[in-house]
Amino acid sequence: MTITVDIEIEDEAWTTAEADAEALVWRAAQAVLDAHEDIEGQGIVILLTDDDSVQALNRDFRKKDYATNVLSFPSPPNPEGQIGDIALAYGVCAREAAEQGKPLAHHLQHLVAHGVLHLLGYDHERDDEAEAMEALEREILAGLDVPDPYASDEEGR
């Protein structure tokens, strides 16, 4: 089954910083979907937006009044087969990439993969869940030539 990935760019800062942001997002989302051929559903919407918009979503839906890098909103079962929506905040993502010394393109692809995995039911609340999700992220990102995003985290443990 083909799953549509619709990408909406609300904040042009994304394409100013990464001219091929839309293609990067699509490739990362598609890599996750390709690794899960048994998915039931029709579509995912990914919104590249600003910090204020993500803060409003986080406040309204999670009761947390701050911007975060990525939010995932799995859809309840629906006749359209929508899997869910993802929103990414440019300012937070760009700041994190700079602080972590990695290209924004790599961080963007990591967060898209992370968000899509959440839509598919993966979580990281417990250590065993986090390890499984991170392992899958590493595998997917390696296929996109994105270095292990958790490598520096583990060196510090």
Curated annotation (Swiss-Prot):
One of its GO terms (biological process) is rRNA processing. Zn(2+) binds at H114, H118, H124. InterPro entries: MetalPrtase_cat_dom_sf_prd (IPR023091), YbeY (IPR002036), YbeY_CS (IPR020549). Its EC number is 3.1.-.-. This is Endoribonuclease YbeY. HAMAP family: Endoribonucl_YbeY. Single strand-specific metallo-endoribonuclease involved in late-stage 70S ribosome quality control and in maturation of the 3' terminus of the 16S rRNA. SUPFAM superfamilies: Metalloproteases ('zincins'), catalytic domain. Gene3D superfamilies: Metalloproteases ('zincins'), catalytic domain. Belongs to the endoribonuclease YbeY family. It is found in: Cytoplasm. One of its GO terms (molecular function) is RNA endonuclease activity. Keywords: Cytoplasm, Endonuclease, Hydrolase, Metal-binding, Nuclease, Ribosome biogenesis, rRNA processing, Zinc. It comes from Caulobacter vibrioides (strain NA1000 / CB15N) (Caulobacter crescentus). Its main location: cytoplasm. The keyword Disulfide bond does not apply. GO terms for cellular component: cytoplasm. The gene is ybeY. It is an enzyme of class 3 (hydrolase). Its cofactor is Zn(2+). Binds 1 zinc ion.
